[in-house]
């Protein structure tokens, strides 16, 4: 495990996990966003973390052919919580986003607005968390379509939408989960577990 983040958190990580490596270096996967404040929350640590995450996520942005090759060569990354609003417009499938309904609504609103502007289309009705809860599969599929990312939508039924090795859409649904997964912080644990599996 390698940790890169604020010094006060580094000390807590080392106290709990002395074998953790602190600082930059080689990784097999990234997990970003857990514990990172959203853009609307100000603070020096949060700003520094967000700047670092934004710089990392730029490497995953799809664009020109050279940029695409570089993006596909990057290790898998899990983008959670406070980093979801930093997601580039188009990313490859090894980018996994893990929003809950409220975060998904914000993400869909951002990307639908960008798509409407690019296509000179009429603007869409804003999504709400309730819209996502009422149509979770359609929401997850739309997020995948707009971003290219593999989408893991957290909820009563966890929905994963991505593509298989041949580029075909793949959907996995799981309604089996322990009750503790509905408590605050369990999404951070999920992101960490997913990052470990992707490594």
Residue ranges and their predicted role:
Residues 179-181:
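Glycine-rich phosphate/pyrophosphate-binding beta-alpha loops
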Residues 106-109, 183-199:
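Short, small-residue alpha-helix embedded
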Residues 2-176:
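Glycine-rich phosphate/dinucleotide-binding loop and adjoining beta-alpha-beta core of small-molecule
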